[in-house]
Amino acid sequence: MAANYWVSTQRRHWLFTRERLADIREGFKERDKVAHSQFPLPDQRLLNIYFSQQLIKLGKRTTTRQQALATAQVYIKRFYTKNDIRHTNPYLVITTAFYLACKMEECPQHIRFVVAEARSFWPEFIAPDVSKLGECEFALISEMNSQLIVHHPYRTLSELTPELQLTSDEVALAWSVINDHYLTDLPLLYPPHVIAVMAIIVAVVFKPSQTSFHGSAGPALAGAMRDGGVNLLAALGDKNGNGPPRIQKLVGWLAESEVDIKAVIECTQELVSLYEIWEQYSEKHCKELLGRMVKSKNLDK
C-alpha cells in the first residue's frame, strides 16, 4: 500500500473545496428537481450519522476494526460525489462499501456472510442474491476509478502521541473526535494530518471531565465546545504565553510546525456544527425517509 499521503490518489483526486462539493450537490438537484421535491432527506450530516450507525451494526458481530469502518465511510462519501443518493439504494451501497473496505483493510469477510448480516438488519432492502452486491462493488470501484487506498488521521495521532506527551485520556478523546469527523464532509476537504492535529487540540483544550470515550465524542464534547472551557481561537492566537502550560506547549508546537492553523480552526468549527445539529438526529426519521424513497422508486429490486 502507498504509505505516502502526499503522492496519493486521495490527495490528487479526492480532495474538494467546499464550493465544489456544493456545486456537485446542487447539480444533482438541478438534474432531478422532481425527485428532490418528492423525497426530501435530512441534512447530510444527519444522514452520515445514520449511515455510520448502520456500518457499526454490520461490523459488530465480526469485530471489524474501526479503520475498516472509516474506510467504508469514505467510500460512501466518494460514491455520492458521483451519484445522487435519490437514484440509489443506500442500504446496498453501505453494505458494499463495508465489504470492499474490509478487503482493502486486510480483514476480509465472505460475501455470503456480509449479505446475510445485512439482510438480518434490512431484509426489505437487501436481496438474498449475492450477485447484487457483486454488481454494486463493481460500480463502487468504477466510480472511484479503482483508487481505493484511504489515508486516515489515526496514524498521525499515533505518531504525535509520544512527541506531544498525550495522556491516555487525551488519546482516547482525540480518537473519538477522529471517528466523529467522518460524519462531516471533512474527509473530502482536508488532509488527514490536519484532522489529527484538530482532534489533538480539541482533546487537550476542551477535555471534559469524563475519563473514557467509546466511539463518538459528541455528547461529551458538545457543551464544552459550544459553551465554554477554553476558547480555542484565543488559545491558538495567544502568543504571550498566557493560559495553562499544557495548552501553551501545544500552541508552541503548532507555531513551529508547518500545519495550517487556519485549516485546523475551520475543521474545529465544522465539528462544533456537527455536535449542534446532532441534537436533531432521529434514527427513526432517517429510516422512514430513506425507506419511502427506496420503495417508491423500486431501488431495492
UniProtKB/Swiss-Prot annotation:
Compartment(s) of residence: Nucleus
Protein's recorded name: RNA polymerase II holoenzyme cyclin-like subunit
GO biological process entries: regulation of transcription by RNA polymerase II
This protein's UniProt keywords: Activator, Cyclin, Nucleus, Repressor, Transcription, Transcription regulation
Entry's transmembrane regions: none
Bridged cysteine pairs (disulfide): none
Organism expressing this protein natively: Aspergillus terreus (strain NIH 2624 / FGSC A1156)
Family annotation (Pfam families): Cyclin_N (PF00134)
Family from the record: Belongs to the cyclin family. Cyclin C subfamily.
Alphabetized CDD domains for the sequence: CYCLIN_CCNC_rpt1
SMART domains the UniProt entry points to: CYCLIN (SM00385)
Keyword Cytoplasm attached: no
